[in-house]
């Protein structure tokens, strides 16, 4: 499992590097074109995407039919890529983009060795190989005795103050660590896996709500829960964004319960009912 985790983390490291290079590249050409820089660092705005498309097209024209990368002495630019340095910057970005695609493609092949992927995750709309890789590599299902164990590990449990788990000071716990001198000390630490939480709520959640509700159970759950919040006096005053985040959180918690119920039997492990099933007799329909 450590090997696939290294592969998944490596893929996302390449992706992060590619995004950073893309932002710098677009920023450079925005300055050249006299456009204001983007305010978002983690993704491109509409103008940025158009610039990248134009750069790709220009790069293709300038390098088409050339066996080796052009040398500076022989370089002749166009109205988009006008000097050799710009050509090198675009080439670097496209190389990273290619590495990223290859890495995620190989990850998809690797996942075929895992029954939880071939028998379950692969068939769920909105869960691609990259997200399946995150789930399989970050979660040790043998350590999740209850569905709530997954919620806690993913940072989706409720803290002692009744609020959703976060990095707030009141949600931190004391954990021991060994300092540089080999001495055991204590420090305030989070209780969850931040990488997993970010991918589940930020990436998987967004993927689910892009699916049609009649073909994705989790989109249907999101819509239903958000509608309930909008019609509850206790939540009417909350912003749309707050209710959206609450619905995403709820949807992912249901997904984790379904994941638990599918994964544990595949590993020959006992399955415990959720609190709502054990105490209230409520059940969720299976994912499709």
Regions found by a protein language model. Name each.
Residues 1-110:
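Long, charge-rich intrinsically disordered scaffolds of nucleic-acid metabolism proteins
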Residues 5-23, 27, 133-138, 198-206, ...:
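Short, hydrophobic/amphipathic alpha-helical patches that form generic packing surfaces
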Residues 39-48, 182, 188-189, 284:
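Extended non-catalytic scaffold regions that mediate assembly and binding
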Residues 40, 161, 226-232, 277-288:
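Eukaryote-specific, cytoplasm-facing alpha-helical/coiled-coil scaffolding segments in long proteins
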Residues 102-141:
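Coiled-coil termination/hinge junctions
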Residues 120-121, 134-245, 249, 262:
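Phosphate-backbone recognition surface of nucleic-acid-processing proteins
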Residues 126, 167-175, 275-280:
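A glycine-rich phosphate-binding loop feature that marks nucleotide/adenosyl-phosphate handling sites
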Residues 239-275, 284-287:
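Basic, amphipathic alpha-helical segments enriched in Lys/Arg and hydrophobic/aromatic residues
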């Amino acid at each position: 499992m450590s090997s696939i985790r290294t592969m998944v983390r490596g893929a996302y490291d390449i992706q992060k590097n590619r995004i950073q290079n893309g932002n710098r590249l677009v920023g450079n050409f925005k300055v050249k074109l006299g456009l204001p820089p983007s305010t978002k660092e983690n993704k491109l705005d509409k103008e940025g995407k158009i610039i990248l498309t134009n750069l790709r097209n220009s790069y293709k024209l300038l390098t088409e039919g050339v066996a080796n990368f052009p040398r500076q002495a022989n370089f002749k630019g166009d109205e988009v890529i006008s000097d050799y340095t710009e050509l090198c910057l675009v080439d670097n970005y496209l190389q990273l983009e290619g590495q990223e695609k290859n890495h995620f493609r190989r990850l998809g092949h690797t996942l075929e060795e895992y029954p939880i992927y071939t028998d379950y995750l692969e068939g769920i709309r909105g869960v691609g190989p990259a997200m399946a890789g995150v789930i399989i590599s970050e979660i040790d299902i043998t350590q999740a005795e209850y569905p709530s164990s997954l919620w806690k590990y993913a940072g989706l449990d409720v803290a002692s103050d009744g609020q959703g788990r976060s990095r707030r000071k009141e949600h931190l716990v004391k954990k021991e660590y060994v300092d540089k001198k080999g001495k055991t000390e204590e420090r305030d630490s989070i209780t969850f896996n931040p990488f997993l939480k970010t991918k589940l709520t930020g990436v998987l959640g967004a993927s689910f709500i892009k699916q049609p509700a009649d073909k994705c159970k989790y989109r249907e759950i999101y819509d239903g829960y958000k509608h309930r919040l909008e019609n509850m006096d206790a939540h009417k005053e909350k912003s749309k964004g707050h209710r959206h985040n609450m619905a995403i959180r709820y949807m992912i918690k249901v997904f984790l319960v379904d994941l638990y119920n599918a994964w544990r039997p595949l590993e020959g492990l006992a399955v415990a009912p959720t609190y709502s099933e054990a105490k209230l007799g409520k059940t969720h329909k299976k994912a499709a």
